[in-house]
Amino acid sequence: MTRCFLKFIFILILTNLSFKSVANDKILLIGDSLSAGYGLEQAQAWVHLLQNKYSDDNKAITIINTAISGQTTDNALLKIDAWLKAHQPSHVLIELGGNDGIRGFPVKLLQKHLTQLVTKSQQHGAKVALMEIHIPPNLGPRYRQMFTDSYSKVTKQTGAYLMPYFMSDIAVDSSLMLNDNLHPNVKAQPIIRDFMSIEIDKWLQD
């Protein structure tokens, strides 16, 4: 009886360990200055705050942040193969396009690059989320609309997950922005952390 009970406990432990191993989510974040913590100490940036939250909540989620200030979709395409090989992510979150838009890159080129980033990640076995980026109004209503629509088009074509933009409510509040009116300040970082915590949970459960 005792031997059977011990065997049962041992199987439960192995099952639990196996479940924990499967439940580990490794998210490769490919982004620009908005995720790189532009103008801030790294410990103040939303990605660092969110990773701390996952640790505090005992969530087996790791964020690998490859965000670089000024990064465009074509820059990321030059590096994504190496990132995927080095980090072997289960998930890839793409927060890119803002710099493409500010520089007036053609919308079709943006869509092509985003599609390539998504499909490369999917071919590597990762689940992909594409954040719907919005650009400043001074770039003109027609270009802005075509730009924003690119994200839903790419997700429909590729089956990627469309994630809402974390700057939508922040960009219109000057108290949450740096003096350049392009980047979120330190006060905005916990707000972005909480927003992304909710949105990433939705994505992982999708």
Task: Describe every region a protein language model picked out.
Residues N75-D206:
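Alpha-helical cap/lid subdomain in secreted, periplasmic
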Residues I9, N24-I27, K59, I68, ...:
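Catalytic-site microenvironment of enzymes
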Residues S35-A36, G70, I135, V172:
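Active-site micro-motifs of SAM-dependent methyltransferase domains
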Residues E41, I68-Q71, F105, P184:
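Short, surface-exposed alpha-helical recognition segments that flank or form part
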Residues V22-S69, K79-Q88:
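Serine-esterase "nucleophile elbow" of acetyl-processing enzymes
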Residues F10-L14:
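Hydrophobic helical h-region of N-terminal Sec-dependent signal peptides
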Residues M1-I9:
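Bacterial N-terminal signal peptides that target proteins for export
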Residues S18-K20:
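N-terminal signal peptide c-region/cleavage motif recognized by signal peptidases
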